C-alpha cells in the first residue's frame, strides 16, 4: 500500500449531474484532507495523482475504463450500466468507495454510510458554484461570476419565502404557455414531447424570473433557449477531449458560439436592468412593482466584487434561467411519459386534482400542497428517472476516512434509488407508493417530492441540496396537472402497456428520450 505522506494535496473540484445536478455542485476549498488508500485495483490516475490507489470500477482493466469514459461519450456503458453492479461490489459489500470517470473527471463514488457527514458539512468548507463553473468552463464566458453567492441568495432569501404568493402567477403563466404551445385541439396532433414540455416550462419559469413583459417576449425566450443549449454543449464537450493541461486553453479559444448567444441575450435583458436601477434610484417601489428574480438580483447586496454591475446582474439572470428551466422541463417530461406508460393512474390523478381545486376555489398554493397522489407520482418518477446516475455530495467522514483536497466525490443516486434494501419492489413503477407511505406512517412531509433523504437524491442531500427544489416541484405540479386535466394523450406509435421510451444518457446526465413523440387532443373538444 502507498504511504499517506507521499500523496500530495490539491485544490478540489467537485462536479455533479442533474438539475438539481447543476445546482448541487460543490467544491472542497478550506479543509485539508489526507488520502484514502486501498489494495484492490491499483492504477495511475493522470488527472488526480493523489487518487492513484483508489480502485476503479473496472479494476482488472483500467484502460478499458478510461477508453469507455473518454471515447464513448453518449454510452450508458461508462455510467448507468455499471452503477448497480459496482454499488454492490464496493459500496455495499465492502463499505468502500470506488473510482470512476464522469464528464472527463475522476470521481470517488461514496457509500451511503458517509451521507450524514456530508449533511453536516458547512458552507465555509464547501463552495456551491465554483465547482460548477470549473466543470462547465464558465470562466471563459462570465469570468469569476460563480465566486459570488448572489444566485443562492436570490433563491433562499427572496424566492422561497414568497412561493405561496407567487403560485397564482405561475398558474397564470402555465395556462398561457400551454395555450400558446398546444392550444385547442379537437383532433389528435403529434408533438415531440421533450421539445413541447421544454417550451412550456421555459415560458412558465421566466414569469417568476424576469416578469410578465419579458417572459412573453418571443425574442428573449428564443435567445435564452439558445444560450442554455450552447452553455451546456460548450462547457461539457471539452471535458472529453484528450488535451491534458491544454484542454482549458482550447475551450477558451472555441467558445465563440456561446459568447454570441450570451451577448445576444444580454442585449435584450440589459436595458431592463438599467431601467429598473434608474427607477429604484428615483424612489419607485420596485419591490412591489416587480415581484421577480430580476429585481431581487438587483436588490441583493453584492457578495463579490463586480456583483452590483449591471452586466453581472444580467449574467446572473441568464444562469438562473439555465438552471431553473432545464431541470423542471425534464421532470415534467418524465412524468408525462409515465402517464402514457401507466394509464391506470390517469383517472385517479384527475379525480384528485378536480376535487382539490374545487375545494380551495382555484389553483392556490394550498391546493397544490394537498395533491398527495400527484406529489407521489412525481416523486416516484424522479426515483426511477433521476436527473443523473450519480449525484455529488461530499466531505470529511466519521470513521476516519479522509480524502485530499482535490478529490471529486459523488453518490450513486441511480443505484440507491433502485436498491431493494431501500424500496420494496424497487424496479417497479408504483405511482402512489409515497402517498401510501404518508398515510401509513403518519409522516406527511417526509415523503413529499421536495423532501430529501439518504434514499432519494434527486436534489442532492444535506445543507447543500438544491435550494430551488420547492419552486421546481410547484412548476412540475402545475404544468403536469393542467395538461392532464385539459388533454388526452396517446403514443404516436402504439406501445405495450407499461412500456415507455428509454432514458437517454450523456454519461452521468439522464434525460427523457429526446425523440419520443406523442399525440395530444383536447378533452372538451374531441370529436
Swiss-Prot record:
InterPro entries: Cyt_P450, Cyt_P450_CS, Cyt_P450_E_grp-IV, Cyt_P450_sf, FAD/NAD-bd_sf. The keyword Heme applies. Its EC number is 1.-.-.-. The keyword Oxidoreductase applies. It comes from the Eukaryota. Transmembrane segments: none annotated. This is Cytochrome P450 monooxygenase aclB. The gene is aclB.
